[in-house]
Amino acid sequence: MTPGAAGRASFGQSAASASSLKWAALQDAAKVVAGLAGLEPERTTPEIRNFPALIRDTAPWRRELAERGIDDMAAVMEPGIAALLGVNARGADPRAAALTLWREFTHARAAVLALLPPSGAMGPRRSA
């Protein structure tokens, strides 16, 4: 364990694995929200699917911001989905609230994805 930014501990590979799991869980949660909003299922782009691996190879400041963004998205999505499921269970229409949560999520996800450096026509930079 090494000290991270702002007094947070950085656990190296295990932190990357935890972020990867959170990222995948967020994408699954987004599918639920989209369904409750009445939207068609979103196609997962390579950028979204490969984000954890791509961000792992970037500068530490990008990884730290991505981890914070992922944590922030989870902090919004968890209670949001719980509320939407509660509304749906009572027989009320959750579409308007779900659409609002969906838009909030997609904007936050776009901001996190923007942390990836440009990859160019040859794909992301790789180093041995």
Region spans (language model):
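Short terminal alpha-helical segments
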Residues: 1-55, 106-109
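Intrinsic-disorder/low-complexity coil detector
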Residues: 2, 37-40, 51, 59, ...
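Polar low-complexity intrinsically disordered regions enriched in Ser/Thr and small residues
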Residues: 7-10, 15, 38-41, 72, ...
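Alpha-solenoid helical-repeat scaffolds
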Residues: 16-26, 41, 45-48, 67, ...
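Amphipathic alpha-helical interaction modules
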Residues: 31-86
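Amphipathic alpha-helical binding modules
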Residues: 82-128
